């Protein structure tokens, strides 16, 4: 174990110093994906002028309507983001944060980081109990769990710099949905009963919104959010200052002060969304752009793709034991590196160029045995941890001019803390749990972190969110992303591999069964749908196969050679919708 750790550190150091490794030549790139229909089992939604894919049908229609009115992809994305804060309160939000990947019609690709920040009064050991162990109640359900929200700042930055419509126009549909209400769908009803019951009933402000006659709202009930509508109206009228310096800031700060939270008006006034350079890589002739730190997603998607490029994935075939073995082993190495090197780049030096280098990937590829799995303990030791659920949301937008936007944002766990700030109607995040409360001990998603992701004032916690844009021959080819905690990275990875290596259209790639390995716990998690024979072969190779529930909820758009848009929403989310015109 020590030798393996030293080997990885030596390789990283060598790459930072300009070293190299000699390996075999790469396999030839696969043929381009087919856009035919006769031979396909799953068929994507088609449109020519613009398209939106999101987890909620109402929000998707809001975005398409903005596109029809002449708005661009950024205008539509901001409208969808605010709409989801109303219609998908499990994760859609203005009290949380996230990331946006954006590619303009002129070919500029950029990343907007609106991840939450730790308050000024945050301390490294704030989530430890008297025995020095992490206290999940503090980091998940208390007022201490909330970081300074970033969604409003992120949407405003994107709209001001890259949009064409005013804020008071794109936010108007969300205000209407909040004030007039909408019919609760299956997904919201189920999540209120399953997850909401754990956090919402303890808080009267929250219970007054989402409960009726002592029970969570059911499918078919109307959810009206008058106070949230008033908050959105303030943002429409006064811009982000309403949230960060005005009446909404007062509500959040007062809520925190009354209940032992840390966010102050100074924290809110000092929050800034940041535009960053995306992580980029080349995979079999395609350019892949994804989020840089404090998201770990982009680095590790590119890292794993670089490793896979040393194997003939097309020859192995989708769902084969060899393909799954190689991908699982590559994922182990990437997640081990995540725990060691990743954090907020404004606070720690993240060696992302070394981690995403072809040479480093080839060195790892040389360690992968197609016929024998390497135990995670031989990559780096750590503790076992529980499985996680889908508790984030993603949406994708492409407009008639070729502008493309991918957004993943969240409250962290479903409904966040369950706390509504005063009379604002705004649910608050529990994103502070994404910090490493104690190095080497897993968070709610089973992810192990180190000192690079320790709690510090004004720091942004590490994330797995991975909004991703793939480019072919200089043009946007795939816009994708997913919720799913630690499985976000591997879900997005499989969308890329399924389309590029296995020639699937976007609907086929979305419907295909998924699998996941995150190094710790040392198990290969698989959805239903893989052949029992394949799973037996994987076990014979040394994989510890565990059948799990559905993974991820991708919302993706593929652009054909002629500009035709092909979209697909994930069947794992029953109320999502892809639509265009």
Question: Which residues does each PLM region occupy?
Answer:
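Active-site rim segments in enzyme catalytic domains, especially the processed small/beta chain
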Residues: 86-111, 262-264, 404-472, 502, ...
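Bacterial N-terminal signal peptides that target proteins for export
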Residues: 1-11
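Noncatalytic scaffold domains of N-terminal-nucleophile
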Residues: 26-61, 73-74, 78-239, 243-245, ...
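Bacterial N-terminal signal peptides
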Residues: 9-20
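Internal maturation/activation junctions in enzymes
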Residues: 30, 311-411, 423-424, 439-440, ...
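Extended C-terminal subregions enriched in glycine
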Residues: 438, 459, 501-549
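Alpha-helical support elements that line or immediately flank enzyme active sites
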Residues: 66-67, 153-161, 238-245, 250, ...
């Amino acid at each position: 174990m020590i030798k393996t750790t030293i080997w990885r550190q030596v390789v990283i150091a060598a790459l930072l110093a300009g070293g190299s490794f000699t390996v075999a030549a790469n396999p030839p790139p696969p043929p381009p994906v087919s856009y035919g229909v006769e031979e396909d089992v799953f068929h994507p939604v088609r449109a020519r002028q613009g398209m939106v894919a999101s987890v909620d049908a109402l929000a998707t229609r809001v975005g398409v309507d903005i596109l029809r009115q002449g708005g661009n992809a950024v205008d539509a994305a901001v409208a969808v983001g605010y709409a989801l804060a109303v219609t998908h309160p499990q994760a859609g939000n203005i009290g949380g944060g996230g990331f946006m990947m954006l590619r303009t019609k002129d070919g500029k690709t950029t990343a907007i980081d609106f991840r939450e920040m730790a308050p000024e009064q945050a301390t490294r050991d704030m989530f430890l109990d008297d025995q020095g162990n992490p206290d999940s109640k503090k980091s998940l359900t208390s007022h201490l769990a909330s970081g300074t929200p970033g969604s409003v700042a992120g949407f405003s930055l994107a709209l001001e710099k890259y949009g064409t419509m005013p804020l008071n126009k794109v936010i108007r549909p969300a205000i209407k949905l909040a004030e007039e209400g909408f019919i609760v769908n299956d997904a919201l009803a189920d999540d209120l009963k399953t997850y909401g019951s754990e956090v919402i009933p303890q808080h009267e402000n929250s219970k007054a919104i989402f409960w009726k006659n002592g029970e969570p709202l059911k499918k078919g009930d109307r959810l009206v959010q008058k106070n949230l509508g008033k908050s959105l109206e303030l943002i429409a009228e006064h811009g982000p200052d309403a949230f960060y310096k005005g009446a909404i800031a007062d509500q959040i700060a007062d809520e925190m002060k009354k209940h032992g939270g840390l966010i102050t008006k100074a924290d809110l006034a000092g929050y800034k969304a940041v535009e960053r350079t995306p992580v980029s890589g080349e995979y079999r002739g395609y350019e892949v752009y994804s989020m840089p730190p404090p998201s770990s997603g982009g680095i590790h998607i590119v890292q794993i793709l670089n490793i896979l490029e040393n194997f003939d994935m097309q020859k192995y075939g989708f769902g084969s034991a060899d393909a799954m073995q190689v991908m699982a082993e590559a994922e182990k190495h990437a997640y081990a590196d995540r725990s060691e090197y990743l954090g907020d780049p404004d606070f720690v030096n993240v060696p992302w160029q070394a981690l995403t280098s072809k040479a480093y990937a080839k060195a790892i590829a040389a360690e992968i045995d197609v016929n024998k799995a390497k135990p995670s303990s031989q990559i780096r030791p750590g503790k076992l941890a529980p499985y996680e659920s889908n508790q984030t949301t993603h949406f994708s937008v492409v407009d008639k001019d070729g502008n493309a936007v991918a957004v993943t944002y969240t409250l962290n766990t479903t409904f966040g803390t369950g706390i509504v700030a005063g009379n604002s109607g705004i649910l608050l995040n529990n994103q502070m749990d994404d910090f490493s409360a104690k190095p080497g001990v897993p968070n709610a998603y089973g992810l192990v972190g180190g000192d690079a992701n320790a709690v510090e004032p004004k720091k942004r916690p590490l994330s797995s969110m991975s909004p991703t844009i793939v480019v072919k021959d200089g043009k946007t080819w795939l816009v994708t992303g997913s919720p799913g905690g630690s499985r976000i990275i591997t879900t997005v990875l499989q969308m890329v591999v399924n389309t590029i290596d296995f020639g699937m259209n976007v609907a086929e790639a979305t419907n295909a069964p998924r699998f996941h390995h995150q190094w710790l716990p040392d198990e290969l998690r698989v959805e239903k749908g893989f052949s029992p024979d394949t799973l037996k072969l994987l076990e014979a190779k040394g994989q510890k196969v565990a059948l799990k529930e559905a993974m991820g909820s991708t919302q993706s758009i593929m652009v054909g050679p002629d500009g035709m848009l092909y979209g697909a929403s994930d069947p794992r989310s029953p109320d999502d919708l892809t639509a265009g015109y």
